[in-house]
Amino acid sequence: MDQELFNRFVKCAVDTLKVDAAQVVPAARFKEDLDADSLDVVELVMALEEEFGLSENIPEEELAEVTTVGQAFDIVVSKL
Amino acid sequence: MQGLGHRVAITGYGVVAPCGIGKEAYWNGLLGPGITGTRSVEIPEWDPLPYFESAKDARRSDRVEQFALAAAQEAFQQAGTLNVEPSRFGTIFATGIGGLHTLEEQVIIRVEKGERRVSPFLVPMMMANASGAAISMRYGLQGPNETICTACAAGTHAIGYAARQIAWGRCDAVATGGSECAATLTSLAGFSNMTALSSTGSSKPFDATRDGFVMGEGAAVFILERYDLAVARGAKILGEILGAGSNADAHHITAPAPGGTGAIACMNLALEDAGLSASDISLVNAHGTSTPLNDAAEAEAMTHVFGARGVAVTSGKGVTGHALGAAGALEAAQVLLSMEKKLIPPTAGTTQVDPAMTIDLVTGFARAWTPAPAISNNFGFGGHNGSVIIGPGE
C-alpha cells in the first residue's frame, strides 16, 4: 500500500467524517467503526475524487459494494 | 382560545439571537443599543458544537437548524419532564426560508465544480421543514410535525396554530417557535434591490426617518402545554396563549393593505378568539420593521383598534433586526421576558416617532409595566397577517 496515497485518503476521511486519523485503518468498517452512513460515504467519495483529481467518477454500483476503508482506498487507487 | 376549552400554558422557552444567546443575555441585549451602520446583524462567532453529539452531526445541519436546536435545548431544559404521550406531543415550527446558506453555497459549487460536487446533504439541509424535523427527532415528538412558511408572519402563525392543536384537543403539548438564517449575499442583494433594506443601515421602527429594515437572524422555541396538565405536574406557568388571529390582505405581494385593514381584522380575530376587548390589552409588541410602508399601516391599524395612544407599543427590531420567519418567535419571547421583568424594553434606534402616527411608542428607556394580556403582531410578504395574545402566568 502506498503510504503517501493512504495519508491523503485519511485526511479526506478525517475532514468529511469527523473521525480521528487513528481510526482510519484499512480494516475499519464505515458503518460500524466510523459511524458513517451511505450519504457520508458518498460525501467522502466526492472529496476523494477531488483530492486525487479523478477524471472519471466512481459509479454508484461500485460504491454500493464498499463497506471498509481498505475497499474504498483500492477503488480510488484503481482509478488513478 | 376557542376549541374544546383547553387552556394553553407556556412552560419553557429558549432564545438564540445576535444580541444574546439564552433568555437572560437576550433580555440584556434588548435593553442595549440599537443597530447602526449594517445591513444585517448576525450571531458573532456562533459555535454549534455544544448543541450536537458530534461535529459531523453539526456539520450536517444548516445554521438555521443549529439555531433551532440550540433554542429548543434551553426551552426543554426549562420545561422539565412533561407527562405527555409522544403521539400527543407535536412540533409546529416556522421559518421564512430554510437552509438558504447551504443552498447558496451548493449553487456556487455546482457552477464552479460541476454537478458531481453538489453535497448529498443539500436537500435535508436546505428544506424549510428541517428545523422542525430535527426538533421532533431529537426529543421524540411523534404528534403532528408541520412547518409554516408565511414569510415574516410565520413565527406568530406557528405559535397560534400550535396553541390551537392543544385547544382543539389534538395535542397535550407542542414545541413551537421559529428559526431563520437567511442573510446570504444573494438574499441581501434581493432585499436591497427591492428597497426593503435600510439604505443607512439602521433599524428605527416608527421613526420619522426610518428607511427600511436591517436583516436579523436567530431562533426562539416554546414549549406549550395543556394548562391543567402543566399545573398537575407542578410546572411553572410562564405565560398563557389566550388567542390567535390569522388572515390575509389579498392586496399586494409586498405592500400592506392601505390603512392596515388586514392587520385590524387580524387583531380583532385574535381578541375575539381570546374573549377579550381591546381595552384588556396593555402592550402591543409590534411588527415594526422600520420600513416606511409597514410601520405607517401598522400604526394606523393600532390606532384603529386601541384608540390614539391607547396602549403601550414597542418593537424589538431596533436591536434584533428583522429575522423574518423567526421574528414572531423572538418577539413572543420578548413579551414573556417583559412579563417576568415587569418592564417594556424601549424601541431602540427610534428617537423621533413619525408625527403622522398616534401611538404610545416606548422609546429611550424601559418602561415599568404590570403584566397583563399583550398582543404580538407580525405581517409577511404575501399579505399574511398574524396576531397572538399572550397572558401572564401565575
Regions found by a protein language model. Give the residues of each.
Chain A
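Phosphopantetheinylated carrier protein domains
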Residues: 42-65
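Alpha-helical residues within the helix-turn-helix
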Residues: 15, 32, 50
